[in-house]
Amino acid sequence: MAHYSYPSPDQHSILIVEMDRVGTFQRCRVVPMDGKSAGTQVGPEGACIGGAWSPDNRWMYFNVEVDGSTHLWRQRAPNGIPEQITFGPTEQQGLAMGPDGKYLITSLGVRQSSLFIHDPSGDHPVPLEGSVSTARLSSDGKRLYYLVEKGNSTDAIELWSRDLASGKSDALVTGQRIIDYDISPDQASVAFTVKNGDSSQIFFAPLDRSLPPRLIAKDARFVSFGGNGTLIFMQLGEKTNYLARIQADGSGLERIMDAPILTKNAVSPDAEWVVVGGVGTGGAIRGTTAVSTRDRSRRGICNGPCLVRWSSDGKYLYVTPGTSIDRLTSSGRTLVIALPRGMAGAQFPPAGLDNASDEELAGVQVIRHGLISPGPNPQNYVFETAAFQGNLFRIPLH
């Protein structure tokens, strides 16, 4: 899907920033203005998030994340070799071409992230080594699980845990490039997705490392434990994705529903509901929706993308409006929705929680963070802060 477009000065071509079937930025693409072909990918292998043309139409410029760092690149049109033009520990976000083609303007700075535990006494930083992401609290709030990036993003992304009382950290799954995971309610097993090039596979492993990880499903992502020895995940197709379920031993693969989805979110603790997102029409999923795993009934939560999580006891729903599973921001807010009658009895605003008025949200607890993981109650949670601190610079072009 195309997100941003930059027409060439001669109006013959368009440089496009696009995402794949799971919402991940891909290489940029150049397509003809007349639409007679799908065009071709350009720039380096990586996540292209911005582009520009030189005024004379000879060069294309890209803002691309490669190996975990975002820099500026250029390529002679139409099929030259990509060249990196910025280097070093700082990164660049965004680019704009000067009117005379002699310089680029970009935001140059550094990315910073921190992890905090919140409890009734306040916020407490968690000292961890390495680049940490996807932190989650155990159901009892005593242990923290998280991913640690080793080297750059093409190397291993490992699963670790930390005992919050003793401060002791342990490696649980190493030597893999893990992009998402879920811990079983009894904290005995883990299911996780590994990224290998353009493909992704789901594995299952005991947390005591008594057995090696076992391959469960190919072309799959966003795995969660689904109760009764099952795993729920998003099955990736050529053009569409589906919500699927499989036994933890790899048997009994089945679709939960036939409607295609764009992404999968959380599964309720009782495995009765799963949250999915989509942009379909007619009978397809639209917005952010909870789907019953029993009778396929639906409950609309947000009109657009939202990140949704349940508390471990299922009594609260945590909803972060305006974000998706792959494009989270540390700003914004998370709504804590009480579920005294469970998900089936929940009442959501007709326009969705992302468009709710102050009156419709009266009495709802608001957490002033987007990247959170619920704890055993609304007063206990873990949150991540992530920010890019930079200033605008002019980059001369020679």
State the predicted function of each range.
Residues 1-398:
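Sequence signature of WD/YWTD-type beta-propeller architectures
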